[in-house]
Amino acid sequence: MNMSTNQGRTTGQSLPNGMLEDNYPRNMWWVAARGDEVGEKPLARWLLEKPVVLYRLKDGTPVALDDRCPHRWAPLSAGRVVDDLLICPYHGIEFGSDGRCTRIPTQDTIPDSMRVRSYPLVESGAFVWIWMGDPEKIPACDPPVDMSYTADPNWSVVLGYYEVAVNWVLIRENVLDLTHIAYLHSKTFKQDDWASVPEVSMDGDTVTYRQDFDLGPLSPLFCHAMGFSEAKPVKREQEGRMPSLAVSFSDWNVHDPEAQPGVRADFLMRGCHIVTPSQRGKTHYFWGAAFDIPNISTELCERTRASVTEAFDEDKALLEQLYAQVSMDPCGVDYPEIGRLGDTAGVRVRQVLQRKLAAEDRSLSG
C-alpha cells in the first residue's frame, strides 16, 4: 500500500472506498460476545456478515452455530435448548453442539447434509472469541488475546457495548488516534494536552504508542474511580497496544506525586477497545475500563460507565455521520485522504490489515 504520514501526503486509496467493502480478515479470532451474554437461551448475533447463534451447554461450555436451519432456513436462535440440543422453532428439528442433526420428528433417517456449521470458540476473561475462517489455519495463527484480567478480582472492571453503523476500521483507527480527544471530547475528557503526537512503534503486527504528560488533572471520566478529585494534579503516562486487529488496549499509568508515605501513589487504568464486523456497514464495539483497584464501589463503577458512555456517544455520532456521507458519495481519488503527523498508528493499522488480506488472497480496493 502506498501510504505516508507526512503532512500533505495522501494516506493511500485503501480507504474511504475500501470501507464500503468486505475488508476484514476471516482467518483470525474475533470477539463474538461478552461471556455474560451467552447462556442457555440462544443468542442471535451477526458476525462477519453471517448469522450466528450462541448458547451454553449444561456444563457451561459455549457453542456457536450457523443461525439457519438447513431445512427451511428458519433462525435457530428463535428456538430453544433442551438437554444441550438446539431445537428449530419451525419443525422441531434438533441439532447437537457440533452442528449435526440428531432428530427429525417426521422420520427416522437423518441425511448427512442435515447439519449446520459449528465454529470454534475460546473464552478468555469476560469475552468469548470465535474463529469463522478456515479451521485448518488455526494452529498457524495467533491465539485469542488474553483477556483474563477482566475476570480478575484484583481489578474493578466496567464494560460496555455499542452497535455502530460504520465500517469496523473507522473505530479501530479512532481508538488508536488520541489526538482527537482535545477536540471531539473537549466537554467530556476535559483535557487539552492530547493534541501532541505520540511515539508510535511496530513489532510484527503489533502496533504500540506511548506518550508522557506533564503534571495536571486526570480526566473526570476516570479520576473518581481512582479516588482523585477533578482538580488533583497527577503525573500520567499513556501506553497503547494493538496486539490484534480485533482488540487494542490503552493503559493510563497514573502517579500521585503528593501521596503521603505509606499511601498508594501509583495506579493503572486499562481501557480495552474490541471491534468485530457485524453486517455491511455495522460493527460490534465492546469497550472496557479496568482499574487495578479491587472492589471499587458499584456507585463509582456506574458513574464511570455513564461518563465513558457520554464520551463514546460523541465518537459514535461523528463516525456514523462520516460513514453515511462516504457511503452516499464515495469520492475515491477525487478526494484522497490527506495525511498528518498524528496518523501514524492508523496507517500502521492499514498496513497490518493489508498483509492479513493479502495472506487470504484478498485486498483493499480504492
Where are these regions (language model features)?
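Rieske [2Fe-2S] iron-sulfur-binding domain
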Residues: 2-18, 24, 29-156, 366
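C-terminal catalytic domain of Rieske-type non-heme iron oxygenases
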Residues: 61, 136-366
